[in-house]
Amino acid sequence: MKKTGKIGSILCLLALLGLTGIYALPKVYVLYQANTGKVDICLKEYMLEEGKEVPWKNGKDVLPGGFVSKIPRIRNDGVECYVRATVSFSSQKESEKPLSLENLEGISSDWVRDGDYFYYKHTVKPGEKVELFQGIRIPWEWKTPDEDNVWKACVRAEAVQAEYFSPDFTGEDPWGM
């Protein structure tokens, strides 16, 4: 019995020393630090009037098949970023041939369309400006008086910081959102 008690005491002491040894091992910490920058873009619209670029003005009368000069320009006022934009149309009256993204003209090959969005394929550097399109072609089908309509084209732009971000322009959703 005395022998068993000694062996048990020795085993307990060894176990206690072993556990203490494990806790005495050096610890390793991994720190991952990511810095975010300021993503800041500005969208302004312009038009050509008598060959000169001027700020966009509403209320232009356009004939069927006519072209409306409208130049949405996105300026990067923050860190390097990727930009995407969408255009939505609304009108006071319904039409058999409503305006759609197909009516946009002058879209550079630097933009890729996926669904309702146009994605700029390159990063936009601080201070850089990119233009989405140059204008809107009014459908030829708008010939009847009931299509004497007031319509709006609303452009919305979004940006995401380029650092730590890799869009996939071959996939279903380039930004994966």
Where are these predicted regions, by residue range?
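Long, small/polar-residue-biased beta-strand-and-loop interaction regions
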Residues: 2-177
